[in-house]
């Protein structure tokens, strides 16, 4: 009995010894999967992502009946019944995704390079050369709407990457598409441009704005000696920044204020003296009257005695 118990204990200890490392390995794998996420070296292409978005949008529209009806869905259905001519947002989103997918395929197939070679004919010997200005002016209005859509899509896609990888002809075409004749190309004349803006402030039909009035084609030859006659240059000296001295204009104002103050003080003092003199005269007269009345009384008393 004792031997059988010893054998059972040995078997259990041996199994525990073998199971322990297995548990540790499994726990280690779980921790690695939990805290470590492998970095994908290859990014899924944009066309595949667009296809996935289109498929999810279509599947969402087909499986929406199986899901519980939400309040927003019921309200959208009610408004769609009340306004049958209103645009469908899901349909617009799906059409936009299809359009992006089509433009992505056109861009990946190299259609933009075909358009640039056809209309602008960049140099085949040097891939980083600018397009001739005359060719750009003549052939850019010939681009169709589909070509311009592809160009806009290419600009939006390539501007997200490294701009140092862009070619000079594409940058030139990008700048021309965005700004046209603005900036340094003010001397160019666009043949198919809109007419000049009419005056909306005065509302006179015969007055038109001309944005090139300020440009003078004549070269102005001004010598350095004539610059002083055209522009008066003021040189600031250190006396202007000295707080101990006062400029002549400030001195004149301060002197005028002091003069006016002294004049007002003298005038007020003279008026005060003229008011005091009548009071003194009245007191003297009253004293004289008193002395005269006393003298008369003294004379009367002497005559009666």
UniProtKB/Swiss-Prot annotation:
Disulfide bonds: none annotated. The keyword Cytoplasm does not apply. It comes from the Eukaryota. Keywords: Membrane, Mitochondrion, Transit peptide, Transmembrane, Transmembrane helix. The keyword Membrane applies. Residues 1-24 form a transit peptide. It is a single-pass membrane protein. It is found in: Mitochondrion membrane. The chain crosses the membrane at residues 250-266. Its main location: mitochondrion. GO terms for cellular component: mitochondrial membrane. Involved in respiratory growth and required for cell survival in the absence of prohibitins or GEM1. Belongs to the GEP7 family. This is Genetic interactor of prohibitin 7, mitochondrial. It comes from Saccharomyces cerevisiae (strain AWRI1631) (Baker's yeast). The gene is GEP7.
